[in-house]
Amino acid sequence: MEMSSKRKHSSGPISLRSTKHLRSDTAASPQPLTPDDQTLGEEAVYVLDNEDEDLSHVLPLAPAAAAQTDSPEWQATIETVVKSVVSIHFCQTASFDTDLSMSSQATGFVVDAEKGYILTNRHVVCAGPFWGYCIFDNHEECDVRPVYRDPVHDFGILKFDPAAIKYMPVTELKLSPDAAKVGVEIRVVGNDAGEKLSILSGVISRLDRNAPEYGEGYSDFNTNYIQAAAAASGGSSGSPVVNIDGHAIALQAGGRADGAATDYFLPLDRPLRALECIRKGVPVTRGTIQTQWIIKPFDECRRLGLSPEWEAAVRKGSPKETGMLVAEIVLPEGPGDGKLQEGDVLIKVNGELLTQFVKLDAILDSSVGKDVHLLVQRGGEDLEVSCTVGDLHAITPARYVTVAGATFHDLSYQQARLYAIACKGVYVCEAAGSFKLENTFSGWIVDTVDKRPTKNLDEFIEVMKTIPDRARVALSYRHIRDLHTRGTSIVHIDRHWHPHIREAIRNDETGLWDFTNIADPLPAEPPVPRKADFIQLDGANHPAAADIVRSFVRVSCTMPVKLDGYPQARKAGFGLVVDAEAGLVLVSRAIVPFDLCDINVTVADSIIVMAKVIFLHPLQNYTIIQYDPSLVQAPVKTARLSTNYIKQGADTIFVGFNQNFRIVVAKTAVTDITTVAIPPNAAAPRYRALNLDAITVDTGLSSQCSNGVLIGEDGIVQALWLNYLGERTASSHKDVEYHLGLATPSLLPIINQIESGSLPKLRIMDMESYVIQMSQARIMGVSEEWIEKVAIANPARHELFMVRKVDCASPLTEDTHQLEEGDIILTLNDKLITRVSEFDIMYHHETLDALIVRNGQEMRVNIKTVPTEDLETDRALIFCGAVLQKPHHAVRQQISKLHSEVYVSARSRGSPAYQYGLSPTNFITAVNGVKTPDLDSFIKQVNVIPNNTYFRLRAVTFDNVPWVVTMKKNDHYFPMSEYIKDPSAPEGWRSISHDKELLRLDSDNLNADAMDEGRDDGISDMEPDGEK
């Protein structure tokens, strides 16, 4: 258990944690438990696995009893029961309350065949937006929708259309809660471990277990649970627990995650009552005094002060009882606050002795709005109190609001009970967009926005309505795990990528959540010029370092959607001002990877101005951005860039910014200059630097600083120190970040062209090369004459370049490659190539006359260069939660054949793309048998598909394996929209809707933080693992 958790434990032995038996669909892989996870508490562990993964290391497949041959009676019972059991495949399409958006599988069973009701767990029905379907035993499928989810207890009811099941009679299971007794042999029939049907056997061992705690997610309470040994695992949530008569006597809910064959079942008393109310069409009333009770045995009750007289009376009235109900948590400001205390032993309710949760629930549920009278013993003294019963549904959120990319709702009773706090406040259930706070997905309580209190969701909405786009406001908040500490942040309100304040309200008639745009964005206020001064370096021994401070600005970049395989939704670092008069800043492309983003430049730690992308270098890992210099009244200085390449062994001054964004200075020397290529990312291609001379220096600060410069004593910048995004490690699933120097002379032509008023339109050789030494070159067929020429041309490094990989051509264009893997390049336009900088000749030539060595033979080839403006992404389609785009440059660099121009770049949690396994790096080649070679043809085909209808996608994996995806369209939660690059638009891009009826954009609920961009894992927005 985490130290920060406020979970209370009983004085009894510490038990290992329980797990909800959901099974996640294909997307995510199991996460290792920490030692604390494995030894303390009963917190939530969702079983995330692959279809073919061996789960024996998580839970045993079945106890010994399961291996025994069933009797004929049991066989007949099972044959009847399986016809009522369904496999449920579902998504929670948006994060809500205790759960993030997700896709999973579980089990349910029919309890009313005529009206079409299915009983399953509450954590299956979901507190938030639900979308799913069920599969019957004969593999018929039909849609399901929620009609009821209990606010506290772990059960919910789904509805299906019985007429949709045509090839088998729909049968129901009778609910018999009274048949659950110790020693009864049972069978758990369900979707265990993700299988269509599993039958596990066991014997009921306890009826009086307290509800298991699942940690910081949803947990049941104020009910007893039934315990048995059945060893169910992922996917068995909601399975019926049946006796030999074929009656459902309990509902599978959870189990131990430590390998013990122990499962926990919910008694069916309250589900039966809810089902009867729904059948009659009357509300399922639920009452509460906002107090959690737990069962404690008589010996513990005596230590709390239970008198012998009351113990004798209780034992006489209920001879089989072994314990009583004791107050565990009394919520502040609730009906019981000031009247009940933790440790109170409950004796009577409304004058009747009471020791069971079922009777307590019955009284409270029938007394909403009325007073109940409780007799408790506190420290051996009788105490009578009266409490007004509240409506449990009223303190269970049934609406949420999305604004500026984040999702909010009123704090739920679940969360309030978990942390013993008052059930009030604005809860951030998806901390994203403008409200991405301290790298945590959820759990924040917002106290004030723009210095105005937000005590509830309505107050929060009214405050947010008054805040214009791009405003910066103060936010005061606390995390629910640490309410002692109040945080304050300045947030940048985004109402252009996420323009609407959108309210979602649960509709129990339709099972959907209805969306309403309740406020349009206020236009951004015009920026005003501001003054500032730069810091001065105290005690700096190098005047040049003190002066270069005025050439640094901080750059932050936020992206509304994940494109080009880039793994993060926001990134910050430092850039170098290369033209103060024009507001030009050079920054690493690992910070600004593409131009569908918001860029903010902070000057002198004081002035914040917007910036836009001017130029993206296709190979050298830098971006040039521009801000409006008229808004900056500060002595910003243009950095002077050296025209000469720095040499190995040269003395230099390292000036960089550490992880605390503080400037550091050190005198050092250049240790090496090596031609390198950043390693490709195997999981998902993304931009990486190629064919560059990387500079390393002899100082430990270089590993601590991701951005900076190398300067001479005269203050001239000799090299930029940049961060380079590398590969994702297989072990930690984190991204490696390299810190290397880039010499300035190669930057000057680009900067000079931009300063002259024209944008560079570079052309490149569409290939990746690497250095070979003369010993290799000789073996490959390079003549002695050329080896001598290389030694003369480059005395410092005798090397040539061999083609490692030729980029793949588009399937819609003719393959014009003249180079092949293994070619050794001798000259380009008759100039000997022995340095990376000498490849710059390609930037301004449509064709190059190349002399190469191929298969030991010298030959001349005419190489056609590629315009780099065609390599950048200018369009993105959001469809069923998947981000589709033209294959970007990194894909072409790593693959041998492009199968289409419809490439899956990312997908959102809880979406159809996630549910049905359409993975990032897949290519879509056809829709319903019609070829879709590009985005236009794809849009044309999917536009004719009705909502909530299955269609076929023919796809090809990155490893050239074709497969067919069957997917159901969902326009309600995931309408199709598109981002198109448009220089005339204020942000440089515009969004259009393909939702013909509602004209809604998927950007209304788009969340880059909830997207994953990799093939093999569901982890998103990971911070870099380290540097090399």
From Swiss-Prot:
InterPro entries named among the record's database cross-references: PDZ, PDZ-like_dom, PDZ_6, PDZ_sf, Peptidase_S1_PA, Peptidase_S1C
MF (Gene Ontology): serine-type endopeptidase activity
Annotated stretches, region: Serine protease: 85-269
GO-annotated cellular components: nucleus
Subcellular compartments: Nucleus
Alphabetically ordered keywords of this record: Apoptosis, Hydrolase, Nucleus, Protease, Repeat, Serine protease
Broad class of the protein's primary localization: nucleus
Enzyme Commission number(s) from the entry: 3.4.21.-
Transmembrane segments: none
Bias (Basic residues) ranges: 1-10
Active-site residues, Swiss-Prot/TrEMBL: 123, 154, 236
Entry keyword Ligase: no
SMART domains: PDZ
Record field: compositional bias (Acidic residues): 1019-1028
Domain PDZ intervals: 292-377, 878-959
Region (Disordered): 1-39, 1003-1028
Annotated GO biological process: apoptotic process; proteolysis
Function in brief: Nuclear serine protease which mediates apoptosis.
Family: Belongs to the peptidase S1C family.
Name the record gives this protein: Pro-apoptotic serine protease NMA111
Species of provenance: Ajellomyces capsulatus (strain NAm1 / WU24) (Darling's disease fungus)
Gene behind the chain: NMA111
